[in-house]
């Protein structure tokens, strides 16, 4: 019977935006601008690194990989979300829902793994500068990036296959703006729902907490090494190479902890939806801004690469 019920569910209905119908046009315009800025900002970072030879280093290779993961993550969720804001028909096919979950989880976890790799890169650069070229060889960097992407794809496959092997009984309304795990679990039925929920939660928490602890460990060694530098100028210079990455980590895990660790309440549907949207849209939106403004080397390269071409007469005067 469970498999029969499962086979009858051919589509779901996303009702996350129905809690504030009067704001949908304003939200559409706001999210569209943020989405376009996210794409443009990350493409600008990638183009700058590609065109500026001085940025052909492991740190900026990882930054480009991070930009790719952010572009793909937003593309997996936001275009569909924008279409739903303008439509009264918010149904999504079963396979489309599974695909959205797979790609969003894959690129989301890839993003977390790459942030961990970037923390390790900064640890090697500051704590073992003489061995940096050996430890961060081109082959080693490619391996770290490849493992991050492979790990993200494996996580996406594990979570998606676990959720969509469940039986769904009758109800089709997903109280979210995307195909997300908690609202889909509420639609599932059968004796294995609780086991799957605990298993998926354990896998996701273990992966994210492991990444966070590795980043904390890297920065513990980094801070200890920076404090041993005798001059204030040297300490500031060393810390400046980590500032943008550390800020993105705080934003990424800060928003995630507020959303996923806060107590759930049946009366907080609007708040949960808004916080979920904030994490999905605002975090990728802020990331290129942080890296562009807080990374002096990247900021100078952007001005040299693009500003000088747009305003050559000002470049001559400089």
From Swiss-Prot:
Keywords: Cell membrane, Disulfide bond, G-protein coupled receptor, Glycoprotein, Membrane, Olfaction, Receptor, Sensory transduction, Transducer, Transmembrane, Transmembrane helix. This is Olfactory receptor 10H1. PROSITE patterns: G_PROTEIN_RECEP_F1_2 (PS50262). It is a multi-pass membrane protein. One of its GO terms (biological process) is detection of chemical stimulus involved in sensory perception of smell. One of its GO terms (molecular function) is G protein-coupled receptor activity. Its main location: membrane. It comes from the Eukaryota. PANTHER family: OLFACTORY RECEPTOR. The chain crosses the membrane at residues 26-46, 55-75, 100-120, 140-160, 198-218, 239-259, 273-293. The lineage of its organism: Eukaryota, Metazoa, Chordata, Craniata, Vertebrata.
